[in-house]
């Protein structure tokens, strides 16, 4: 199995409801290590840049408005098959379709306010991590 890194964002809805610790605990219980994290209030430019691939889609404006509505917690997670493991912990994008016990089933209220973001591939993870973190901000854990 491959050790990978993935980007995780606890979105404004989950931050405002104080779910950060519970969400982090689920990552750690699943064997994912938090190797970088920061709380940040995204600017419009930050959100537009991060979600640029969705610029032509109808939901883009609402997504940017939501992601800039309050602080987020951006993290790099590391572990075996981290991208897939993280996405399984998050559950389906639409919380109504998310399996019980997943983050979105437990903490999200709608497909628009769905508690968290996770990279969808190793290539996306590399791009997304670089968007928020310099190499020297990531602390590999050896113990």
Swiss-Prot record:
One record GO biological process: UTP biosynthetic process
Cited CDD domains: NDPk_I (cd04413)
Any one GO MF annotation of this record: metal ion binding
Thylakoid among keywords: no
Active site: residue positions: 117
SMART domains (UniProt xref): NDK
UniProt feature coiled coil, ranges: none
Subunit record text: Homotetramer.
Family assignment from sequence similarity: Belongs to the NDK family.
Function: Major role in the synthesis of nucleoside triphosphates other than ATP. The ATP gamma phosphate is transferred to the NDP beta phosphate via a ping-pong mechanism, using a phosphorylated active-site intermediate. (Microbial infection) Catalyzes the phosphorylation of dZDP to dZTP, when the bacterium is infected by a phage that produces the substrate for the synthesis of dZTP (2- amino-2'-deoxyadenosine 5'-triphosphate), which is then used by the phage as a DNA polymerase substrate.
Name the record gives this protein: Nucleoside diphosphate kinase
Species this chain originates from: Acinetobacter baumannii (strain SDF)
Gene name for this UniProt entry: ndk
């Amino acid at each position: 199995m491959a050790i990978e890194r993935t980007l995780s964002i606890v979105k404004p809805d989950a931050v405002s409801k104080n779910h950060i610790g519970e969400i982090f605990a689920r990552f750690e219980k699943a064997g994912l290590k938090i190797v970088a994290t920061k709380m940040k209030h995204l600017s419009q430019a930050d959100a537009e840049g991060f979600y640029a691939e969705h610029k032509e889609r109808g939901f883009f404006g609402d997504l940017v408005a939501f992601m800039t509505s309050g602080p987020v917690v951006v993290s790099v997670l590391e572990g075996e098959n981290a991208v897939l493991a993280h996405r399984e912990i998050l559950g389906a994008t639409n919380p109504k379709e998310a399996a019980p016990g997943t983050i979105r089933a437990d903490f999200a209220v709608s497909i628009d306010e769905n508690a968290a973001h996770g990279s969808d591939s190793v290539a996306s993870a590399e791009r997304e991590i670089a968007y928020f973190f310099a190499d020297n901000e990531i602390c590999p854990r050896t113990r």
